[in-house]
Amino acid sequence: MQFAYRIDTSAVNPLRNLPTSVATDAPASLPLRNLIRGLHLGLPSGQSVAKAMGVKVLHDDEILLGKFVEHIPVGEEPIPIVRAAGKVFAHNCPLWTYILAETRQYTEDVKIPVTEGLTIKTPRLGPVGGRIVAEVFLGLMFGDKHSLLNQDPLWTPALGAKYTLKDFVAYALGK
């Protein structure tokens, strides 16, 4: 079984240095390309979006860059964004980085299916990232005339009010 990388504010090597066949112009770093794109699109800061949503706004010292693992090697500890990237990001964290940093605050113990009784603490999307993803899915479903939301607008999940994406995937897989 191939597990995905955890959500965090670090970038794996293949994304830090994209091949020239993918990134024909500089920079070759996907994270840097995303940050520049967000700047050019005029995306609001993560803190601005959290405030507009009425959810907890992360403080600068809670927005950490680095790997989010249980056993952090010495010298690889995550560091606050302002210390890593400068005061320009004080109360002004790029939205993409904010969403990734938010996952450090929201973790869940998950059982590893291939090992008996072993669980890991895994990050999950927080209020800002989770809501953006949910609204994109809902927008796609409302935009699809064959979607259940358009076919039967009064439909509600049989599982009740607490129906998660995990439940939806399990249902789709027949579990």
Where are these predicted regions, by residue range?
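Terminal regions of secretory-pathway proteins
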Residues: 1-175
